[in-house]
Amino acid sequence: MASGTAANAAALAAFNAGKKRDDGWKQNNEGNNKSSKYVCAPAVKSQNNKVKPAAPAAPAALAGAVNTNTTNTTNTVTTTSASTTPKPKSNHAVHRDTTPTSMVNQQYSQNNDRIMTKSPRPVLNVNTDSSKQGSYSSAASKNNHDNKGLDYFNLGSATSGRSDTFKLPRYLPHTPKDMINNVKSSIEAKNIANDPSSRRLSANYSPQQMLKNLKTSLNEKSKAPAPPKASENDKGRQILSDMRERLDTSRKIAADQAATRGLAPGFDFEEDGDKEDKGYEDYTWNLTDRKKPVSSNRSAKSFKSFKSVKSTNSNKTVNSIAKNVVTKAGENDQLGTTELNISTPERHGICIDVTYHDSDVEDDCLKNENGNKCANGIGHENGHGTQNENNVENGIRNENQHDNESDIGDQVMVPIKLYNSDKSSISSKSKVRRKPPPSLSQEEYGSSSTELLSTDLKHIMALHAKSSDTFSSGDNFNQSDDQISIAENDAGQPNVGTTAAATLVRRGDTKFPQFPEIKKKHYHSRNIFGLKRHDHRNQNSVIWLDPDSDVEAEGEGLGGEAKYVRGVNRKSAGEDDELEEEEEEEQDGEEEEEEEEEGNEVEENEESEFSDASAIANNFNHGNTKNGVRRLGPQSRPQQAHVQQQQPQQSQQQPVQFRTTMRTTNKRKDRKSKFDEYKPWKNHSDLNYLTDQERKRYEGVWVSNKGNYTNLVVVKLHGVDYSTVKDGKVNLEHIDDSMRAALISTNAYPSSKQEEQESMKSNNGTGIKVNSDGSVYNSAIEVPSQANNQSRPERVELSQLILGAVVKRIWSRSGLPDETLEQIWNLVDFRRDGTLTKNEFIVGMWLVDQCLYGRKLPKKVESIVWESLGGIGVNINTKKMR
């Protein structure tokens, strides 16, 4: 209803506007007619003069001038023709001006194209471009200032042609009622039909229902399941995991901050104030007396303890160097101003190396037996940019005896890396390089003594009675034999840490790493342990040598005392005798020297990496040592050493012996090669004849069914000796013992003792029957020629036949069709009397099984099949002796 009211109001407003402009349009038309040189005469009523009616005026907002293309391009004039909507029942024509160049011919319709207008005047030929009729431009509206608003509802369709216009006889004006109806019809046409099939799916639900469903779905998705209540165990695990995470993060932070610090277990860097609160006394290790710690002042534990330390070639003390370091570190935020304090428990050794490995300087302090020498000293650049190279080569020595501190020479010095940002000013002489790789002899035996049993590590282990496995992986021990200073090599001075005399250790303090006992031998133990055994005529001894030892190379520097030292014997077997004779002579002279020096205690450096700990510890106090070689006397020599070194000689002399007996064949292979009746397609070796196993199985069926119902046969059978049958009864004398016992037990053939005795007398107790022709017949013995020659029926007893009905019942159990069973019967039946002999029945059973295996029946049974049944029925089974 609301839409209809709005349409009516719009139509009335348009009608009133058009009526008011009627007078103005008339005046304009009259002026144009006077000024225009193209004036059309009044039209004469004729049927041929059918013109297209003038289009009604459109509203001003929607009206616009339309440019048209005409043949006369020079005279392009834009004109507007408008006519007011005539009143009802008025048939008079309205004069309008026309031009030959352009003409407005736009028609707008809301319903259809059937309502057209008719003009009383003829219209000139005007070619309009249909593609431009619907386009309105602002420029055209400015040029056509004379155009007035056209009535939208009175315009016809723009797509209608001129031919349709001339067909209408008269002009049919639009009334306001018609316009209102048109608007209503157009609005109703645009409405969606009230058809359930054309509705959308959402139209079936009201907006409230849709919103409700949406809210419920969102609420269900937003609801999260309530977390389960954690038990006490879960809470405890969570707490432990959090603690572990915090510890791990703290460790990572500490490792990042001090990644270059290697501390032995039990060392703490703390400030003086923290130590005073703990209330325990700190000790500094005294090298002169390794068993007693020396107490020191807490105030001397910081950098102040270096006040009395002076270099030999400089007047500057280490205190000034330390202050300079602290000042520079404060500027660079590298080291900080915190003073370091070292506490040394009694059970741990001191080996601290706080260095920055990223710099070019590597400072390494070597602690020898006196504790007052450093292989690589502390080199530092003074304030003027000069470096004390003498400190780098010879180390820092304590010469100031007037200080209040204790003697530094008796204490372990802690070298601290002095950071210097100016790397270019550091001398290249302090730069270190790696030791060259070991020789071929060392690589051959796979020894790595430079890593595990270096001079520094052995020295520290001996000082503190610790084995290598007690040191943590975070400890950083700079090995002197693993680094060589360039300055020392240039000066030609031997490295202090590489000589054997500088690395001697007391026996009593040495604790060796634990390895397997010497009794547990291994196939390559000779190469690993570096053990060389000699078979001497006078005495037996074992020499423990280190294949990586430097004693052989430095034998000349040790006064020629180590010239007898050799590596592990790698010569050929032919040169062993000569080497042993030379070694015996050398050992005899050396033993005399050792007896003179028994009272003297000689320190040694045990460098054997894989030497047995238990054997050396037990024999250490009994044997003698010299120049890094451990010699065990005959009393302390292991008992198994001589036995093992004799075993290879015996094995070489003993010839190779082969087994006298042949090995048994593989039973599993034999089992596979046998024929499997359930899988006959896997082996075809036994398919052409009967095997012993099959024949025994078929004979069992034969024995169980032979002679049944044969006495009921009324037809005379071929080859049967009826002389053994008397009065319809079968004599038991010609029947096997087993059959005889079966007949007697069933009382089928009763017999008396007299008949048996008479039969035995007539046959002399032999059971041999004499035929009528004088030939001897024995049912127990079958001639192979007769068994194989089936063309001629042999003489058989009635009890040795099996009836055809019984054979059919036995063979029918196989499930084969009767046609197949008939073919098998025809292949084996030679007597043609409805019975089968033993051989015929066995071959028939074999053919039945072959059919069950899937083989085709042959046209004729091969002779090899009949030959496989030959023999006297005696089988000899040979069992293998175990």
Swiss-Prot record:
**The EH domain covers which part of the protein?**
783-872
Q: Which domain of life is it from?
A: Eukaryota
- MF terms per GO, please? calcium ion binding
Q: Which residues fall in a compositionally biased region of kind Low complexity?
A: 69-85, 130-142, 634-657
InterPro entries per record: EF-hand-dom_pair, EF_hand_dom, EH_dom
Q: Name one GO biological process term.
A: endocytosis
UniProtKB keywords:
Lipid metabolism
Composition bias, Polar residues: 26-36, 99-114, 384-393, 616-627
| Family recorded in the similarity comment | Belongs to the IRS4 family.
What is the name attached to this protein's record?
Increased rDNA silencing protein 4
